[in-house]
């Protein structure tokens, strides 16, 4: 594939729902333990180090069941859909 062609990246719908549910549960677990959930999740996504995620409510083992690129895709999807919903376009 040359640099002039656009590669396609797709995640199955089922995995999108799984990623969304997982992010919500991990967010809640981190919040309950007094952590800044955004900072901790970003640390995990950037580094791949699961110790950024608490063991509380089995969040650490759960987050490892979904690939980090799938988590990032879901975060980006939710963010952009929210922006589009408010402004009509990105």
From Swiss-Prot:
Domain of life of the native organism? Bacteria
Protein name in the entry: UPF0297 protein Cthe_0151
Q: Extract the Pfam families matched here.
A: IreB
Task: Spell out the family assignment given in the record's similarity comment.
Answer: Belongs to the UPF0297 family.
- Enumerate the InterPro entries for this protein: IreB
Which species is this UniProt entry from?
Acetivibrio thermocellus (strain ATCC 27405 / DSM 1237 / JCM 9322 / NBRC 103400 / NCIMB 10682 / NRRL B-4536 / VPI 7372) (Clostridium thermocellum)
